[in-house]
Amino acid sequence: MAVKMLNVPSLPNIPWQEKPADYKLSSPVWRYSENPVMGRNPTPEIARIFNSAVVPWEDGYIAVLRGEQVNGIPYVYLGHSKDGIHWDVEREKVPFVDDNGNPKMPHYAYDPRLVKVDDTYYIIWCTDFYGAAIGMAKTKDFKTFTRIENPFIPFNRNAVLFPRKVNGKFKLLSRPSDSGHTPFGDIFISESPDMEYWGHHRHVMGRGSNWWESVKIGGGAAPIETTEGWLLFYHGVATTCNGFVYSMGGAILDFNEPSKVLYR
């Protein structure tokens, strides 16, 4: 029986390209033949851009993008597209504010995630809070971006929010680490009744025995609800003589207890 996605709206304009006839690898995914869809410096302020987080918005798509400024400091920017292929990137940084509407800009921001829960969009990124930590904000219109309390103390990264509450609680995947370059490398899950206070931390899965995920792993996009459970795409990292190599893996987490890994 085919696995089906649940609670996912139909997207008639989602970009798609069939698998090339001469594609020789057995991988279930393949690269878009017209890559890159976005140049490395789409605005004068951005020297390099990558790590995008994309959701449907109005009659097209909106993205939160990691843009490294010309001074080397990373930040997050908004991108807009009608078809998911051709993008316009805003020149100004995402303008984060506090609950009173006063500016509350992080020192830096990178590796963003973007998730819709109910009628609110949540932006999650790696921020500077006495070390690498998880920053969070919310918006309903992509004009006002209100900061939320950081869910954890440093050091932590790769936070991924589930797209709906599970058993009445928000669920968040993350990867705790030390002050170095993430040697801990395992994925944990936490829950919250209100997106402010987090607890009930549970281990989800650790680094694998496969070479490509032997150093560290981390959650990618928001988990996808399917007939088999929560489909989680994650990255695995291996160390080579030329530095880190990143690969993509997949896992199925239990519907009601997503700390349980059913398939990997």
Regions found by a protein language model. Name each.
Residues 1-107, 115-215, 224-264:
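Beta-rich carbohydrate-recognition and catalytic domains
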Residues 220-222:
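Active-site/ligand-binding surface loops and adjacent short beta/alpha elements
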